[in-house]
Amino acid sequence: MKVLAIKLVDYREWTERLGYDREWLIQKIQNKFMMKIHEIASQYSTFPLQLRFDNFLMIVDGITNTQLIYMINDMQENLPVGIKTCLGYGKTPLEAQWNASVCLNNKEDKFKEYVDEKIAALHFDINFNTEALKYTSLYDSFLEITNIYVDLSRFLYKIGGILQYLGGDNYLGFVSTNSVNKVIEKFSDDNKIKVGIGIGQNARTAIKLATTSLEKIRNNREKTWHIEEEYH
């Protein structure tokens, strides 16, 4: 699988130049440029995992190196600092992002040609969380969501996957297609978490299919998982 690692250059120095009354401004600018990056990424059929805001990842199977260069140039035009990128390859998203991260710090070829793989996206949703908000505080609910995020991250890490919190009680994960059965086995009898699985040629399609799967689960309350796959 192919993962693009993106690092904002001199990001800390940029934030320090904003003065002491800066945190509100940093949040404003971060959200503004991430909104633009999401828009650009969608045009190239991928999706940014925001991570720390100054570093993020993209699953880029199904995208040519030429398209990647165009996308990077488009992003650079909308960022307040420079960026450094590198393309990594691995049998799993976790391995690919590791290789991409290491590549950021050396002088090897940044864009080798790699074979595209199908992408498996996972859209996780917590059962009854909205209803539970009536009986707990906003902060306690947030802590529960955070704990679940940690648990899901650890599980996916063990099978070579990566995870992003989407907001609310939703999470987005990526695994290799070879690991899908492990996800199904894990959540087939789970009455707390449902997972929509989408398999596609690129990240945007896989995510769309994962969300489609999740909606089908919601319409059939007896199921905890469903899978949709793109065929060519």
UniProtKB/Swiss-Prot annotation:
InterPro entries: GTP_CycHdrlase_3, Nucleotide_cyclase, Rev_trsase/Diguanyl_cyclase. Transmembrane segments: none annotated. The keyword GTP-binding applies. Coiled coil: none annotated. Its EC number is 3.5.4.29. It catalyses: GTP + 3 H2O = 2-amino-5-formylamino-6-(5-phospho-D-ribosylamino)pyrimidin-4(3H)-one + 2 phosphate + 2 H(+). GO terms for molecular function: GTP binding; GTP cyclohydrolase IIa activity. GO terms for biological process: biosynthetic process. Keywords: GTP-binding, Hydrolase, Nucleotide-binding. Belongs to the archaeal-type GTP cyclohydrolase family. Catalyzes the formation of 2-amino-5-formylamino-6-ribofuranosylamino-4(3H)-pyrimidinone ribonucleotide monophosphate and inorganic phosphate from GTP. Also has an independent pyrophosphate phosphohydrolase activity. HAMAP family: GTP_cyclohydro_3. This is GTP cyclohydrolase III.
